[in-house]
Amino acid sequence: LFQCGNAQGLLDWGDYCLDLTGTDVLGEMTTSDFNLTDETGAVKAIGYCYEAFGIIVNKALLAKAGYELSDITNFATLKAAAEDIHARAGDLGFDAFASSGLDGSSSWRFSGHLANMPLYYEFRDDGVTEQPETITGAYLDNYRAIWDLYINNSSASPTSLTTATGDMSQAEFGTGK
């Protein structure tokens, strides 16, 4: 068994993938939405996990800062809450966001997962089904806005982006910081 997780993976490794059509494992799937098929329609990879996009929230800390999830309904309300929490981080004992960084252990959060959001919507709107040579950047302003919000309202200063690590972020979240 090996992972073939996207259309490019199927192009690269499709010759090694068996046709799973009609197999017991495929019959156990509750949705076919995440399966990968080749040009003939043969199922070559099944969706065994699903990564969703969003912000992981410590609801207890959010409440300690005086907010409920229902208070945050769009980017403007997220920004207002994050900036308020960041301004009071010293008194609260935690910051709006865990450390933001671009070292090898954490850059995937921002250069991969976060970047997937504007790309998903651009590709959806443009009907893109394969890796394009270029992007239009239709949603990059949204990416910049959330990236700026993260780096300006986290426990690591924007000047420490090259040294803040994923381990720091995980430790902060895990210890309620």
Predicted regions and their residues:
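Aromatic-glycine-rich donor-binding/catalytic loop that engages nucleotide-sugar donors
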Residues: 60-71, 155-156
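Alpha-to-beta junction loops
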Residues: 1-2, 92, 175-177
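Extracytoplasmic/periplasmic solute-binding protein
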Residues: 44-48, 53, 79-132
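Short, solvent-exposed loop/beta-turn-alpha elements that line the ligand-binding surface or hinge
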Residues: 19-29, 71, 97, 101-104, ...
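Glycine-centered hinge/linker elements that transmit conformational signals in sensory
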Residues: 82-83, 128-163
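Short helix-initiation/N-cap motifs at beta->coil->alpha
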Residues: 73-77, 161-175
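Hinge/lid segment of periplasmic solute-binding proteins
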Residues: 3-53, 109, 115
